[in-house]
Regions:
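Single conserved hydrophobic/aromatic residue that forms the stacking wall/gate
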Residues: 1-7, 11
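Ser/Thr-centric signal marking residues that sit
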Residues: 4, 90, 129
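Active-site-proximal helix-loop-helix substrate-binding element of RNase H-like nuclease domains
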Residues: 9-18, 22-24, 90-126
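Acidic, Mg2+-coordinating catalytic module of metal-dependent nucleases/exonucleases
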Residues: 55-61, 66-67, 71-72, 104-149
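Conserved DEDDh/DEDDy metal-dependent 3′-5′ exonuclease domain
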Residues: 12-92
Length: 149
C-alpha cells in the first residue's frame, strides 16, 4: 500500500536534492547497458592489475553496493566485478580522519573544495568522494598520529 504522503516525501527529496528527472541533459540509458559497459571498464582494470574482485569505494558504500547488487539481479547479470561484501566506506574513514560523517563537512576538514550546487550529482559526488579517499589514504600517517583511543 502506497500512501500519498510517501509520494509527497519522494517529491520533497527530489526538490531538496535538486533532482530533475526530466532534465534534457540527463541522457539516461537502459540500466542493463549501463551496468554492462561499466563492468567492462572495471573488468579491464581488474585484469590489468591481476585482481580477482574490485572493491567499491563510496560515501555510504553499503547503500550503493546494495543498489548495485539489486540492479544485477533485476538485469539477470550473474557476476558483478565487485567483491560481494567488502567495500571501503568514506563515511567510516571520514569519522576516523575528521570526526565528521557528512561529505561536505569531511571535505571542509580536509581542505577539499565542495560545491553545494553541484552536490548529489553522481559524477560530482564520485569525484569528491575519490578526493576524500585519496587524501585520507595518502595522509594516513599524519591522521593516524592524531587519533587517540
Amino acid at each position: 500500500l502506497v500512501k500519498s504522503s510517501a509520494a509527497s516525501d519522494v517529491y520533497k527529496r527530489q526538490e531538496f536534492l535538486k533532482l530533475d528527472l526530466n532534465h534534457p541533459l540527463r541522457n539516461a540509458v537502459e540500466e542493463e547497458y549501463a551496468l554492462q559497459e561499466s563492468f567492462k571498464i572495471i573488468n579491464k582494470y581488474k585484469s590489468k592489475y591481476e585482481c580477482s574482485r574490485a572493491i567499491l569505494v563510496g560515501h555510504n558504500a553499503f547503500f550503493d553496493h546494495s543498489f548495485m547488487l539489486e540492479a544485477c539481479i533485476r538485469n539477470n547479470i550473474k557476476k558483478s566485478p565487485f567483491h560481494s561484501f567488502s567495500m571501503i566506506d568514506t563515511v567510516s574513514l571520514g569519522v576516523l580522519a575528521t570526526r565528521q560523517t557528512v561529505l561536505a563537512k569531511i571535505c571542509k576538514e580536509l581542505d577539499i573544495d565542495y560545491d553545494n550546487d553541484e552536490a548529489h550529482s553522481a559524477a560530482y559526488d564520485a569525484m569528491v568522494t575519490a578526493q576524500v579517499f585519496c587524501k585520507i589514504i595518502n595522509d594516513f600517517d599524519d591522521i593516524n598520529s592524531s587519533i587517540k583511543c
